[in-house]
Regions:
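Membrane-proximal helical "anchor" segments flanking the first transmembrane region
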Residues: 1-130, 137, 259, 274, ...
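Active-site metal-coordination segments of metallo-dependent hydrolases
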Residues: 59, 162-163, 224-228
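Conserved nucleotide-cofactor-binding alpha/beta core module
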Residues: 82-83, 87-201
Length: 320
């Protein structure tokens, strides 16, 4: 039997956790309080400062960008792309908090939804849709659009410390119209997602980075890496189609491109089919990232040979 002292929620906050919480609270306040033009400049300036100061993270991002661009990490073009990646990631945070206060009419005008009929047709079967996304553009904006336009959408989020940081992002995304399922180790998450799919929900999973080390090996940009098996497994076990939905940052908004449901010839062996569908998903991710590499918010080593170069933590409570 586990005592309350052993549970993560019962442990006192560390100083670093407290600072992290207030850092995000401050970012939220700035994004909501400042005039948009000024706020965006402030966040992009912070992105440029991070680019100059966080040398280890910059090296990680440069390594990822170099792989995508097919260039040497020291190439001037890679350096420019790396700097832009920092600016766009800062823009991600500004937009993520800002859109919560934006009138729906204005928001709908600023988000371009391409080929949403692919999802509408898939929903006609009544089995829901699994939406797989790379860490691109602003997935909160995509989720908000669906929630604001009559779709029922759920996402999975990793539980965080301190608990009030998790609560902050839970509240934030629920206000955007998403239902958030906490990622736990009891195995119930998959059951909850299957139930939602059976009720014809959309389930959004940000799925271009494997956190377990046990994901599916795929080839992206000429090198092997891993992606989580979850989207493919959930799709195959529930009967819900799997679509890839990359999001791109535009000058004054965002663009979401809805792909067609992924199809392949099944073997009937679940393990092999999960691997095949995951590889197909990775191919679509590769195309999406290649279309705008600097909009890929990959601030951790994306390929094994990148080693243990310093990286920023995973996006707090990000949908998976």
């Amino acid at each position: 039997m586990t005592s309350t002292e052993d549970t993560p929620a019962s442990k006192p906050e560390t100083r670093r956790e407290t600072l992290g919480y207030w850092g995000y609270r401050t970012a939220e306040w700035l994004a909501i309080s400042l005039p948009e033009r000024i706020g965006r400049r402030v966040f992009e300036t912070l992105g440029r400062v991070a680019y100059r100061r966080l040398h280890g993270v910059r090296a990680t991002v440069a390594g990822n960008q170099a792989r995508v661009l097919g260039a040497d990490p020291t190439d001037e073009h890679v350096d420019h792309a790396t700097r832009e990646a920092f600016e766009l990631y800062a823009r991600f945070w500004f937009d993520a908090f800002r859109i919560r206060t934006m009138p729906v009419e204005e928001f709908n005008q600023r988000l371009v939804m391409v080929d949403v009929e692919n999802i509408d047709r898939a929903l006609e079967a009544g089995k829901g849709v699994v939406c797989a996304l790379p860490h691109m553009g602003n997935w909160d904006a995509a989720g908000h659009w669906f929630g604001a336009n009559g779709y029922r959408i759920a996402a999975v989020a990793e539980e965080l410390r301190p608990p009030r940081l998790y609560d902050l992002f839970l509240r934030h995304r629920e206000e955007l119209g998403m239902r958030i399922i906490g990622l736990t180790k009891d195995g119930h998450v998959g059951q909850q997602l299957k139930q939602l799919l059976s009720e014809n929900w959309l389930v959004a999973l940000v799925a271009d980075r494997d956190l377990t080390g046990r994901g599916i090996e795929v080839e992206m940009f000429g090198e092997t890496r891993r992606v989580p098996a979850g989207p493919a497994l959930l799709s195959l076990s529930s009967g819900a189609p799997l679509v890839v939905c990359p999001v791109y940052t535009r000058d004054d908004g965002w663009e979401v491109r809805i792909g067609e449901p992924l199809e392949f010839e099944r073997t009937g062996v679940m393990r092999e089919d999960v691997a095949a569908l995951s590889r197909l998903m990775a191919e679509r991710f590769e195309r999406a990232i290649a279309a705008k590499p600097t909009d890929w918010h990959m601030f951790q080593p994306a390929w094994p040979e990148a080693g243990s170069t310093a990286a920023v933590p995973a996006t707090p409570a990000e949908p998976r």
